[in-house]
């Protein structure tokens, strides 16, 4: 495993944090297996996130998520988690910044310990959160496509991607099955009618108004 020596310098107070408590740039998830509790899996988490022309710093070992000023390289705190990730209770999950739009912060509460039974990893405790920058509300989002209303879908936000949009990957074979079952409507139905089951996935771009 490649390791880098990293320190955090407070430009205003001059204090230096050795960050010795940062074990890795990846989230280490402990997977419990019957008869073998020493096995671990590793989930890669992006530390620097570019969204809408801005850059954000969200290390999973830190309680604070920052926006970076490109001109001064200053760090401006935007979100603070409680309890601390270094507390026994707070250490049960990692908080990840997944994306930013003009109005929302998209977050993921990733549980730090997973159960694995019969070679199947079970993760039913991790969940997504959205912070409304206008109202200060925090809620768990549910996304549905009006052309595929029976299916709840997950999103992907690309680092340095286009401002105020998310992406969804739709497998061609799944769209063909949904088409045959009469679950598709509108533009998505038209797209599915022109697909073969072994075609490449369809990438849908969702723009926030």
Where are the language model's segments positioned?
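Short, small-residue-biased leader/transition segments that mark boundaries at the very start
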Residues: 1-2
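Hydrophobic beta-strand positions in blades of beta-propellers and related beta-sheet-rich domains
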Residues: 6-8, 65, 126-132, 203-205
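Loop-centered beta-sheet repeat module
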Residues: 8-70
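Surface-exposed loop and turn segments in beta-propeller and other repeat-based domains
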Residues: 14-40, 74-92, 135-154
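Structural signature of eukaryotic scaffold interfaces centered on beta-propeller domains
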Residues: 30-54, 92-105, 155-162, 208
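Short consensus segments that form the blades of beta-propeller domains
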Residues: 55-56, 116-122, 192-196
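Loop/turn-rich, solvent-exposed surfaces of beta-rich toroidal or solenoidal domains
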Residues: 91-162, 168-171
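Blade-level signature of beta-propeller repeat domains, shared across WD40, Kelch, NHL, RCC1
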Residues: 161-209
């Amino acid at each position: 495993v490649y390791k880098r020596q990293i320190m955090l310098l407070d430009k205003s107070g001059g204090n230096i944090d050795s960050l010795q408590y940062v074990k890795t740039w990846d989230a280490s998830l402990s997977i419990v297996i019957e008869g073998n509790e020493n096995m671990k899996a590793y989930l890669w988490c992006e530390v620097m996130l570019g969204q809408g022309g801005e850059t954000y710093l969200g290390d999973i070992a830190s309680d604070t998520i920052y926006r970076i000023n490109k001109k001064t390289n200053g760090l401006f705190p935007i979100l603070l988690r409680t309890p601390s990730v270094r507390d026994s209770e707070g250490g049960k999950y990692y908080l990840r910044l997944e994306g930013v739009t003009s109005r929302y912060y998209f977050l993921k509460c990733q549980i730090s310990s997973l159960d694995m039974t019969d070679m199947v990893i079970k993760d039913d405790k991790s969940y997504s959160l959205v912070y409304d920058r206008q109202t200060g509300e925090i809620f768990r989002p549910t996304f549905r496509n009006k052309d595929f209303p029976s299916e709840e879908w997950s999103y992907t936000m690309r680092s340095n991607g286009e401002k105020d949009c998310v992406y969804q990957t739709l497998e061609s074979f799944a769209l063909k099955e949904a088409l045959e079952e009469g679950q598709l409507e509108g533009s998505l139905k038209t797209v599915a009618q022109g697909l073969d089951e072994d075609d490449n996935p369809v990438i849908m771009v969702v723009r926030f108004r």
